[in-house]
């Protein structure tokens, strides 16, 4: 699972869990077919749709030196009805 970095838990992503959509950050060089293959292989689910967008990096300053963080890619994966990813299906308390 080199391409999938981690799951994202924001207000929007928690709301999308009710629609059987899961959000995760992936490496920016990964393709949609790779991500779909990894999700189907490692989690044993069927993916029916994928949406992605690239989030920009942010500027970081250390004294007079201005740097930046790398941009990253976020995928919203829609699963077929009846499938779910158990570790990501937790309620917020």
Swiss-Prot record:
One of its GO terms (biological process) is translation. GO terms for cellular component: chloroplast; ribonucleoprotein complex; ribosome. Its main location: plastid. One of its GO terms (molecular function) is mRNA binding. Gene3D superfamilies: 3.30.70.330. The keyword Ribonucleoprotein applies. It is found in: Plastid, Chloroplast. InterPro entries: Nucleotide-bd_a/b_plait_sf, Ribosomal_uL23-like, Ribosomal_uL23/eL15/eS24_sf, Ribosomal_uL23_CS. Keywords: Chloroplast, Plastid, Ribonucleoprotein, Ribosomal protein, RNA-binding, rRNA-binding. It holds the Pfam family Ribosomal_L23. The keyword Iron-sulfur does not apply. Binds to 23S rRNA. Part of the 50S ribosomal subunit. Belongs to the universal ribosomal protein uL23 family. This is Large ribosomal subunit protein uL23c. It comes from Prunus persica (Peach).
């Amino acid at each position: 699972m080199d391409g999938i970095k981690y799951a994202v838990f924001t207000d929007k992503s928690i709301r999308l869990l009710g629609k059987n959509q899961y959000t995760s950050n992936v490496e920016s060089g990964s393709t949609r077919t790779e991500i779909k293959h990894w999700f189907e292989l490692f989690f044993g689910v069927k993916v029916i749709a994928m949406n992605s967008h690239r989030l920009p990096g942010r500027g970081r300053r250390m004294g007079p030196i201005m740097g930046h963080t790398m941009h990253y890619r976020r995928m919203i994966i829609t699963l077929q009805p009846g499938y779910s990813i158990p570790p990501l299906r937790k309620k917020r308390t």
